Curated annotation (Swiss-Prot):
Name assigned to this protein: Phosphomethylpyrimidine synthase
Role noted for this protein: Catalyzes the synthesis of the hydroxymethylpyrimidine phosphate (HMP-P) moiety of thiamine from aminoimidazole ribotide (AIR) in a radical S-adenosyl-L-methionine (SAM)-dependent reaction.
Family recorded in the similarity comment: Belongs to the ThiC family.
Gene Ontology BP term (one): thiamine diphosphate biosynthetic process
Species of provenance: Sulfurimonas denitrificans (strain ATCC 33889 / DSM 1251)
Keyword Oxidoreductase among record annotations: no
Catalyses which reaction(s): 5-amino-1-(5-phospho-beta-D-ribosyl)imidazole + S-adenosyl-L-methionine = 4-amino-2-methyl-5-(phosphooxymethyl)pyrimidine + CO + 5'-deoxyadenosine + formate + L-methionine + 3 H(+)
A Pfam entry, by short name: ThiC_Rad_SAM
Length: 460
């Protein structure tokens, strides 16, 4: 689909969606997402020009179906996949990618750190119709034999260019963590929990020099502009526990990310901001407001946040609670957490669990925001339940297979797909049936209402 769109623009001096938006041009990608979001193409264009909305769509990922991330759009979710040094398998990551798309993740990040990273990424992008993001520092370190002291700006830029050529649509860049922030880490309970952030800290400690992503930021922007790679400005100092939430280190980095946002916009590079982390429920709204103020309303992309530190094995639930609140208060995309968080590498089933938890959170956020039409599917589900239309209920559920599977555990025969009860209440105790029998006699209800009024009048 995008091949023809990209081909027509191949000779343009700048090829980013932000560049076209600033020129007053509505691209085919903007028209496409406008239809999906049920918004006007002009609103999409103006939001991109303003920096409040992005369409991550590398010019080389021509099979990609454009999508929008921003406060004007529906709340999106990202699924993280990727190999590790302990477990790496190209086919396994492709399977996770397929699961991510089947359960309707909006984007995916390949966070591979083990195996042939280029081959894994190539296979993931080839199998994907959604934007793919990466954290380039993982491959940069991999390519220098995991020796942080051998990391150079030249290697860093070469890896970024290579990934951009492959079709990566957004990079997480840890450019906001500066030398001046290092002393603030000492006050923390858990220090640095971001892998990229910890690697940058190790590099700065080794060389006693400024963060190379910050030093080479202009060169990074040039690469992004050539391929229309959006920047996801990473939160190296996100809190990894409730005790560290909203501290000076986190907010100091956020301020720098705001400055980097303006520099990216000057070069027509699209930007979103990454956020925490582990945050108590009562601090989430404040975190969303601070991001908007410090980062000029660029889309906020949050990991959770997890609202408790003791949910090991259930962190997809703990974090989805925080994600729903964050989405309600303005986050544009939610990065999923799986049940394996803090415990191990997720498998395909963990990916499914994480996606569904976060689809629930994002949908709840859209309803809370009062987004037009967000609740329509919920109302349709309510109608199907009240009519005992089981097959329609399965179709409307975020995880249709799971809904059908649970119903079939106790009532597997097809005849029960027409039954006016489930195994919870049975035919005699179903509140729907009891209510329907009452509602079928409106005259009796009116008679009761008259009697109540008469009693009240006599009592007065």
């Amino acid at each position: 689909m995008r091949s023809l769109w990209v081909e027509k623009r191949k000779d343009d001096p700048v090829k980013t969606q932000m560049y076209y938006a600033k020129q007053g041009i509505i691209t085919q990608e903007m028209e496409y997402v406008a239809k999906i979001e049920k918004l006007s193409p002009e609103l999409i264009r103006s939001e991109i020009a303003r920096g409040r909305l992005i369409i991550p769509a590398n010019v080389n990922h021509t099979t990609l179906e454009p999508m929008a991330i921003g406060i004007a759009a529906t709340c999106k979710i990202n699924a993280n996949i990727g190999s590790s040094a302990i477990a790496s398998d190209v086919q396994g990551e492709v399977e996770k990618m397929q699961v991510s798309q089947h359960y309707k993740a909006d984007t995916a990040m390949d966070l591979s750190t083990g195996g042939d990273l280029d081959e894994i990424r190539k296979a993931v992008i080839a199998s994907s119709k959604i934007p793919i993001g990466t954290v380039p520092i993982y491959q940069i370190l991999h390519d220098v034999g995991n020796k942080i002291e051998d990391l150079s700006i030249e290697v860093m830029l070469e890896v970024l260019e290579r990934q951009a050529k492959q079709g990566v649509s957004y990079f997480t860049i840890h450019a906001g963590f500066l030398l001046e922030t290092m002393p603030k880490i000492a006050k923390r309970k858990m220090g640095i929990v971001s892998r990229g952030g910890s690697l940058m800290a190790a590099w700065m400690m080794h060389y006693h020099r400024e963060n190379p992503f910050y030093t080479a930021y202009d060169e990074i922007l040039d690469i992004c502009a050539r391929y229309d790679v959006a920047l996801s400005l990473g939160d190296s100092l996100r809190p990894g526990c409730l005790a560290d939430a909203s501290d000076d280190a986190q907010l100091g980095e956020l301020k720098v990310l705001g400055e980097l946002t303006l520099r990216a916009w000057e070069k027509n590079v699209q930007v979103m901001i990454e956020g925490p982390g582990h945050v108590p429920l009562n601090q989430i709204e404040r975190n969303m407001k601070l991001q908007r103020e410090l980062c000029h309303e660029a889309p906020f992309y949050i990991l959770g946040p997890l609202v408790t530190d003791i949910a090991a094995g259930y962190d997809h639930i703990s974090s989805a609670i925080g994600a729903a609140v964050g989405g309600w208060h303005g986050a544009s995309m939610l990065c999923y957490v799986t049940p394996k968080e803090h415990l191990g590498l997720p498998n395909a089933n963990d990916v499914r669990e994480g996606i569904i938890a976060y689809k629930i959170a994002a949908h709840a956020a859209d309803i809370a925001r009062g987004r037009k039409g967000a609740r329509d599917i919920d109302d349709e589900m309510s109608d199907a339940r009240y009519r005992f239309d089981w097959n329609r209920q399965f179709e409307l559920a975020l995880d249709s297979e799971r809904a059908r599977e649970y119903h079939d555990e106790t009532l597997p025969q097809d005849v029960f797909k027409e039954a006016e009860f489930c195994s919870m209440c049975g035919p005699k105790f179903c509140s729907y049936k009891i209510t329907q029998s009452i509602m079928d006699n409106p005259e009796a209800i009116e008679q009761i209402a008259r009697e109540v009024k008469e009693r009240e009048a006599l009592g007065a």
